[in-house]
């Protein structure tokens, strides 16, 4: 019989990760991962009372830790528990006293006559201002270049000798110049001869100023450029009135002569033309097809599809949109009269087949927008206060006009006399501000009548101290409620009591028995 092969168990860490959540971990796996074995407990509780840090005992690899091992033959090591030795320097530092810096005289504090004022010694203070600027120029001598041996060419013939001499190479010269400058904020250097605005170019300087003139420095001017005067900021021109426009911002676009693809919306043979006057057609066209709620977030700029049940018949808000199942997006065009037209192409679902298909005609819904009317220009007045622009008009009530003829003599007998009827008062009497007195006795009481300001006819309020009654004719039908009573009569029974506080009804008294035979 073959012996079963032993399968190696998985690592402890992987077993702990898979079985910890299920709670099926072996005890040895839990103790090893969580460090709760017997050896771990000995080290854990034993290290609390004993310290083996300086002996090099640990669970490392035997390398001596971070600092390594100390050989026995080399100097003494540091013992655990003892105070470390303080390393002192070989030279003792000397203390610097005040005598080395400034001479100080001692004062006897016992003698009261000694002054406590310390005399000041005159010494030259430090110069804080910069002195002379020292300029140092370091010039390095030219080093000697390498020597080049030139070959000498000789010939044995009688011709002249030709010597080829190579030029000596010249090394670059290195010069370093140092410069020191101090900034003085109270001194300003003017680099230009004329403190005006201008532009400089090489040797010929041309200064261009506005209103203050200028100077020309350099060569003579050869070319004269004719300058044009710019108008001042207060001058303006009044333009001619523009012709009437069809839009607020007209754009000149070239007219493209071509044929539009598809069916034209104005084709009356194939598409029904319906003019819409309701302004909801521009913003919310779906409200003309069916009753719905208003959603301010949704903008109807796309095609609207309306689904309607076959058995359900709804009346639209507008009869022109009856049986409309699809309404296209808005299209903008221009009419021959110059108006802007907003169009929407709709499809009706008038007929429905058994298969579910809807058949209907196409409808062109459009609305022409109003044109921009051209108004006459209005002369505007300047803002502000100006003399002679105000007009004061006084009515005839506030002024008196007297017709006086200076040419006539007042004492002349030919003066025309006026009639006395002109002196009569033609004023209509108005009792709107009068008071009404109630009572026939002499000692009457005055009552204040309030006046109500109204645009209607005058109304007055009169106070009556005797009171008044207001009768409102009305009739009420109060139904009488009949409560049901039992058929048996109500019998009140009083018990016989000799106390004498009540009387028993005679019918309730006990009758005496009559005996027929004694």
From Swiss-Prot:
InterPro entries on file: Late_L2 (IPR000784)
Gene Ontology cellular component annotations, sorted alphabetically: host cell; host cell endosome; host cell Golgi apparatus; host cell nucleus; viral capsid
Subcellular location: Virion; Host nucleus; Host early endosome; Host Golgi apparatus
Pfam families reported for this sequence: Late_protein_L2
Intrachain disulfide bonds: 19-25
Residue ranges of the motif Nuclear localization signal: 1-10, 510-517
Entry's Gene Ontology molecular function annotations: DNA binding; structural molecule activity
Post-translational events: Highly phosphorylated.
The keyword Transmembrane helix belongs to this UniProt entry's keyword annotation: no
Presence of the UniProt keyword ATP-binding in the record: no
Family label: Belongs to the papillomaviridae L2 protein family.
Role: Minor protein of the capsid that localizes along the inner surface of the virion, within the central cavities beneath the L1 pentamers. Plays a role in capsid stabilization through interaction with the major capsid protein L1. Once the virion enters the host cell, L2 escorts the genomic DNA into the nucleus by promoting escape from the endosomal compartments and traffic through the host Golgi network.
UniProt cross-references to HAMAP family, sorted A to Z: PPV_L2 (MF_04003)
Name of the molecule in the record: Minor capsid protein L2
Organism of this sequence: Human papillomavirus type 8
Gene transcribed to yield this protein: L2
